[in-house]
């Protein structure tokens, strides 16, 4: 009697090809990595965070400042040494080298392929060429199991939502437009579909990112799109309103990043005042003195920004403002720097970061006369941060005694030993945290990714200390 084999028996059990993956750089690069990983997984590739045992490695790079370039080149070198088969993508991939060459190719000529940022299809083409995708007659018939939201590299309870790519500004210290191009806004229907999918998947905090969130829709002249059968204008105000509406049934947060201080931002403040989205704005001001801002080719001026911030606080007294600044920009005088320190005290910026100016290859700021010695740039950065910490400390002290909603990020032993979380004033990774003490009630537990109420009892540096209630 002959043996009859089932179809499953006849199919090869050859393991799926494995791709090692490293993601470097900012949240915008992270979302590019998520798109690539989602596509790899949808096509049947296995992925890992290590080079060992991988059939090839993809390195998503950063090329904005010298330290980031070095880290990216070093990582590519490590991947080549440990694995030998490397595909490079990201901002460094778009960076030119000597002559008309490519920097990555010049430094690491043995890489398999090099692409710029936001190039999922080009990366997949390179993967297919060097590691043909697996064929499974059963899996090939299954739709993408990851849905619209795809694979996320963040913790499950928060996610980045990129609304556009590129930038129309030509700031003299920045080379992003040369790597990521001019502004290209995503269709508003696609953005809102992804947001809803993320909330449905359990995300409790959505962080809206881009190179210039305020300019969303400028490139398409605020074209009217459609979502859920309704017309929606491709513009920041309508986007934020819709995101708040989608988040509300889930009790989730929406946080805005990379918001240029245009007058149109004023229209969004009432949505913050009414709780539609978090009263938090990440606004990259960079400096306050009009002459420095002119050399930077930045919009607005310190005085206009002071007026705008005051107006924002009138509309929404609870607003928290985060910003980044550059100390020691070429030609910056002591008087111009003193102007920046005074601006910080007057504006009362809640959260501030500062970089000592560093020349970026390809930036037009390199041609501005008056490059300051490194020790002067670093000394000014330290002085700026001392003032920023002074302002931040006063702001944090004002919260002692208040009860705040906190999103739990860590909770060992269900929080019985305490944990950490963040209030609406704290974006992940760049701001402080709320250090949660053990709950007073034995029955009280904490769970990562859930909200809890906590009474603020003190401060520690940039952080708050609280007891869950």
UniProtKB/Swiss-Prot annotation:
**Ranges for domain MTTase N-terminal:** 17-132
| InterPro entries per UniProt | Elp3/MiaA/NifB-like_rSAM (IPR006638), Methylthiotransferase (IPR005839), Methylthiotransferase_CS (IPR020612), Methylthiotransferase_N (IPR013848), Methylthiotransferase_N_sf (IPR038135), NA-bd_OB-fold (IPR012340), Ribosomal_uS12_MeSTrfase_RimO (IPR005840), rSAM (IPR007197)
What's one GO MF term for it?
protein methylthiotransferase activity
Give me the disulphide-bonded residues: none
Question: Which reactions does this protein catalyse?
Answer: L-aspartate(89)-[ribosomal protein uS12]-hydrogen + (sulfur carrier)-SH + AH2 + 2 S-adenosyl-L-methionine = 3-methylsulfanyl-L-aspartate(89)-[ribosomal protein uS12]-hydrogen + (sulfur carrier)-H + 5'-deoxyadenosine + L-methionine + A + S-adenosyl-L-homocysteine + 2 H(+)
The primary location reported for this protein is cytoplasm
Keywords assigned by UniProt, alphabetized: 4Fe-4S, Cytoplasm, Iron, Iron-sulfur, Metal-binding, S-adenosyl-L-methionine, Transferase
HAMAP family the record matches:
MTTase_RimO
Ubl conjugation found in the keyword field: no
Q: Which cofactor does it need?
A: [4Fe-4S] cluster
Main EC class the enzyme belongs to: transferase
Per UniProt, [4Fe-4S] cluster 2 binds at 167, 171, 174
Q: What does this protein do?
A: Catalyzes the methylthiolation of an aspartic acid residue of ribosomal protein uS12.
One biological process term from GO is: tRNA modification
Where in the cell is the protein located?
A: Cytoplasm
Q: Which NCBIfam families match?
A: 30S ribosomal protein S12 methylthiotransferase RimO, MiaB/RimO family radical SAM methylthiotransferase
Q: What is its EC number?
A: 2.8.4.4
Encoded by which gene? rimO
Record GO cellular component, one term:
cytosol
Q: What is this protein called?
A: Ribosomal protein uS12 methylthiotransferase RimO
